[in-house]
């Protein structure tokens, strides 16, 4: 992007990560995701050649995400998604990942695209969680009513708050680390929690049904 440095990896960590923190504050404040070109020209590489940034913004986003590690499906995740689909549930994704490429690439590489009837990305809609609009986009695409929806997420302050803001009928958080207590508040408190993604199969036996007796209160074990 027009910068000369003896250690590009270190420069990237020292400069771009710091600038991204400032961008993230803005994004969370306004519940907005900036277009890829704007992200780099306004926040991350404003002192670089603007024309080169414009041409390479999408690739820069993708490579920046790769420095954070490749996203992989959680253990039992693919099998759980396929089984829930077989049981008749309509499923979707609402993602706040930066860049337009990563989610689509992941869905195609893992063969999971056919199992999701809506995929909403803040990098496409420019609306991010917990902003209510992106949840409405998802419901509108599949023709769902909020009272018939359940949101499953691992971030209380984005996933759960947003789902509750649009009156989802149910919210479930994933507590992957049992020994790390959830930081619950009245606003982000989900209806239940699970410790493993496949635990969803115990909760949702059949479309239109919830096994209430299988629900684990979010305070359990805290």
Task: Describe the predicted segments one by one.
Residues 78, 82-83, 90, 94-222:
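Asp-based, Mg2+/Mn2+-dependent phosphohydrolase catalytic module
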Residues 1-75, 79-82, 86-87:
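N-terminal helical cap/lid subdomain that shapes the substrate entry/recognition surface
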